[in-house]
Design a protein with these regions (language model features):
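Hydrophobic packing residues in well-ordered alpha-helices of helical domains and bundles
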Residues: 146, 178, 223-230, 267-270
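Long, charge-rich boundary regions
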Residues: 6, 36, 42, 128-199
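General detector of N-terminal leader/presequence modules that precede the first folded domain
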Residues: 1-42, 150, 154, 234
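Short, contiguous alpha-helical
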Residues: 58-97, 109, 122-129, 165-211, ...
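Acidic/histidine-rich alpha-helical segments that form the ligand environment
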Residues: 40-41, 47-81, 99, 152-160, ...
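A short small-residue
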Residues: 130-133, 211-219
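Short cysteine-rich clusters marking metal-coordination/redox-active sites
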Residues: 100-103, 115-118
Length: 288
C-alpha cells in the first residue's frame, strides 16, 4: 500500500465518522494503524543517529512542499541537528504539542480555545506524546504486569545453556543475545527502582535522564544471576509501590527529555518497555 493509499484510508475513516458510522471509522483507523506498524516492522531499521538524521533531512523537502506548520518544520530541523550531533532532543526543544483533529493545525504548549484555521474548539486537539510508553495504564494493570515479568524472564531462559543465552541473533532491533536483552531489562529495572524511590521521597523529583542501553556490568554475570537480581529488585520495588499513598501515583517529576512525568506514567513506561522487549526475546529464543 502506498503513502497515497494510506491517506485515502484515513480520509475514508473521517468520512465514515462524519456520516455517523463510528464503528466503520474505527475499523478503518485500525487498518491504517496496522499498515503503518507493519511497514515499520518489516522495513530496514536505521541503526545510527547519523543515518536517522540523514533520513529526516531527506524528508524535509517533502514536508515543506506539503506546507506544514512553519514552527513544526523549524522544530524538526533543530531536532534533526541535535540527533546528528549525537544528543537527545530535550523537552525544552520539543515541548507539549497538539494537532487539530479537524484540519491538522499544530499548536505548541497549549491548544487554543478555537482553532485559528477551521474554528474547532479546544477539545478536538490531540496531544501527541513523545512515546506511547507514557500513555498511562490503570494502576492495577501496571502493577500486575510489573509483577509478572520476573517469572516470564525466568521462563525464557529455561533449558538454555550459557552458550545459547550468549548467542546473538540478528533482527529488527539489530544483533542481540538473550543475555544482552536480559541485562538491558535489569539495567532499566534498576533505573525505575531508583525513580520510584525518588517519587516516594519527593513531591516533585528530578528524573535525571539515562540512556537505556545494555549495562556493561551485567556482561560479567551469568543469565541466572541477571534473572535473580532482576527478581530481587523488582519484588522490593513492588513492596514499596503497594504501600505508597494513593496520591503518590499522581506526583509529577521533571524529566529532561519528557518534561513532567507522573509516577503512574513512569511505571507504565517501564511495563510497556518490557512488553516490547518480550517480542524481541521470544524471537531470539525461537531462533536458537
Amino acid at each position: 500500500m502506498t503513502d497515497l493509499d494510506l491517506a485515502a484510508l484515513y480520509r475514508l475513516a473521517r468520512a465514515a465518522s462524519d456520516l455517523g458510522h463510528y464503528n466503520l471509522s474505527k475499523l478503518l483507523n485500525v487498518a491504517a494503524v496496522s499498515v503503518v506498524n507493519r511497514a515499520a516492522w518489516s522495513g530496514s531499521p536505521l541503526t545510527t543517529d547519523r543515518a536517522l538524521a540523514e533520513a529526516v533531512a531527506a524528508l524535509e523537502p517533502q514536508l515543506r512542499a506539503a506546507q506544514l506548520d512553519q514552527h513544526l518544520l523549524g522544530a524538526l530541523q533543530r531536532a534533526r541537528e541535535t540527533v546528528a550531533a549525537g544528543q537527545l532532543v530535550s523537552y525544552e526543544e520539543a515541548p507539549i504539542i497538539y494537532v487539530c483533529r479537524v484540519c491538522g493545525a499544530v499548536a505548541q504548549t497549549t491548544p487554543p480555545e478555537q482553532c485559528p484555521y477551521c474554528g474547532a474548539g479546544q477539545l478536538v486537539f490531540q496531544l501527541i506524546p513523545a512515546t506511547f510508553y507514557l500513555e498511562s495504564a490503570a494502576v492495577p494493570i501496571v502493577m500486575a504486569q510489573l509483577a509478572r515479568t520476573p517469572n516470564w524472564l525466568e521462563a525464557i531462559f529455561s533449558g538454555l545453556t550459557e552458550t545459547q543465552a550468549a548467542r546473538r541473533v540478528d533482527g529488527h532491533e539489530g544483533e542481540w543475545s538473550l543475555h544482552e536483552a536480559a541485562g538491558h531489562l535489569l539495567d532499566t529495572q534498576e533505573l525505575i527502582a531508583l525513580r520510584v524511590q525518588l517519587f516516594l521521597e519527593h513531591e516533585s523529583p528530578n528524573l535525571n535522564a539515562k540512556a537505556l542501553w545494555q549495562s556493561i556490568e551485567s556482561a560479567r554475570w551469568s543469565a541466572a544471576d541477571i534473572v535473580s537480581k532482576f527478581r530481587l529488585s523488582r519484588e522490593a520495588m513492588l513492596i514499596q509501590l503497594r504501600s505508597a499513598p494513593a496520591d503518590c501515583w499522581s506526583r509529577s517529576g521533571q524529566h529532561v527529555e519528557f518534561g513532567p512525568v507522573t509516577l503512574q506514567q513512569q511505571c507504565t513506561y517501564f511495563a510497556k518497555h518490557e512488553h516490547w522487549h518480550m517480542a524481541q526475546m521470544r524471537r531470539i529464543r525461537q531462533a536458537l
